[in-house]
Amino acid sequence: MELPASTAPSGISIENVAKTYPARKGSAEVVALDNINLNVPEGSIVGVIGRSGAGKSSLIRLINGLEQPTKGRVIVNGTEITSLDEPALRQARRSIGMIFQHFNLLSSRTAFDNIALPLEIAGVAKREIAKTVLPLLDMVGLADKRDRYPAELSGGQKQRVGIARALATSPKVLLSDEATSALDPETTDQILELLKRINADLRLTILFITHEMAVVKALADRVAVLERGHIVEEGTTYNVFASPQHEVTKRFVSSVTGSQAPDWLLARLKAERGPQDEAVLRISFRGSDAGQPLLSQIARSFGIDINILNGQVEMIAGHPFGTLIVSIPAEPELVGQVSNQLKAAGSAVEHLGYVA
């Protein structure tokens, strides 16, 4: 099913944006965002991840024009949102859909009527409203729930109504504010699959904010990591997962991959080498290397035993990525040679310490 598409250019461009909130009652001013530059290409899915207080909510409020930046420009669908007066901004928002963490449905309206609300506000005739709402109910899998009230729907069904409502005005851009945070893991997966299908079917540009790296891994083409009002890392989802550079990014990535050392190993890990200790290495395999027998080749080449302590291989953005934590004999020359051979094969290697 395909909804009518706007001919306006799609995508989001955030240029040198800062947002500072003034001091209140003796407290210092708050710098929520500082020199933010971010491009969301047409038809892409971009995730912005950050901890609480990183500036995510401020960013999304600037994109939909709910707040003005202290400096910089926000361009959505070819229109500079930050330069519009209120009537023009209301019109521009029709091309921007929004879904929320807590659904924001009207309890006195049925699923059909909640989806119809933005069309009613826009003055669309009732006959035309039905032509839009019924296909949307079908798209989100709620054709049989059109007359149900929010209290009669599950959390996942409420979010599906919210998604359909966001699509009612045929937007070119969809903003998602922690849309899966209130859902259980199974329902989260279903909503993410729905968003991916909508992105593909409608060529919809999606920007979502989240604090969950698993959501980024499942949904995003690209990711930007926000920390204390700054974008500290940005890139394709695969590259950010495979080779995180910033410490905040590394913590996010380790929470959903096998790159984090298990607690039992951390409890035994030592910084200094003892006489009977082995060196502990963390090895990341990218792309086709994730399926290659590199460790067995190295074990034969150097005549050593390699003990696998932890790890996994998974798919990220359609590409295999593997992480293994291993121990090998701790002679410095040997550790260096093994590390160099792994790096020459395209793997990333980190020496974590020593273990008895």
Curated annotation (Swiss-Prot):
Belongs to the ABC transporter superfamily. Methionine importer (TC 3.A.1.24) family. It is found in: Cell inner membrane. Residues 12-253 form the ABC transporter domain. One of its GO terms (molecular function) is ABC-type D-methionine transporter activity. It is an enzyme of class 7 (translocase). It comes from the Bacteria. InterPro entries: AAA+_ATPase (IPR003593), ABC_transporter-like_ATP-bd (IPR003439), ABC_transporter-like_CS (IPR017871), ACT-like_dom_sf (IPR045865), MetN_ABC (IPR041701), MetN_ABC_transporter-like (IPR050086), NIL_domain (IPR018449), P-loop_NTPase (IPR027417). Its main location: membrane. SMART domains: AAA (SM00382), NIL (SM00930). It comes from Rhodopseudomonas palustris (strain BisB18). This is Methionine import ATP-binding protein MetN. The complex is composed of two ATP-binding proteins (MetN), two transmembrane proteins (MetI) and a solute-binding protein (MetQ). SUPFAM superfamilies: ACT-like, P-loop containing nucleoside triphosphate hydrolases. Keywords: Amino-acid transport, ATP-binding, Cell inner membrane, Cell membrane, Membrane, Nucleotide-binding, Translocase, Transport. Part of the ABC transporter complex MetNIQ involved in methionine import. Responsible for energy coupling to the transport system. It is a peripheral membrane protein. ATP binds at residues 50-57. Its EC number is 7.4.2.11. It catalyses: L-methionine(out) + ATP + H2O = L-methionine(in) + ADP + phosphate + H(+); D-methionine(out) + ATP + H2O = D-methionine(in) + ADP + phosphate + H(+). One of its GO terms (cellular component) is plasma membrane.
